[in-house]
């Protein structure tokens, strides 16, 4: 099973607003959208190949409550990610934090 990292965060915004912000965040992070479905509130993206990775697949699913679930997983049979998947997810949430109102502190 390829290495992966997944995290969720709920934003005080509607599903459509979070979806549009995710589309922008993917672009700002330098990732490429391969599929985008506004009705299902899902985005599939990819990263480029690099020195330490064959690239990663990124899946974003937005819930009706403004919750964004983001998962980054290695492509192919790569089982060690050297922290790349976590960095991808963190980069997307950092970009979303600038595009959307901040979630309430817990």
Language model segments and positions:
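Ser/Thr-rich, low-complexity intrinsically disordered terminal regions
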Residues: 1-106
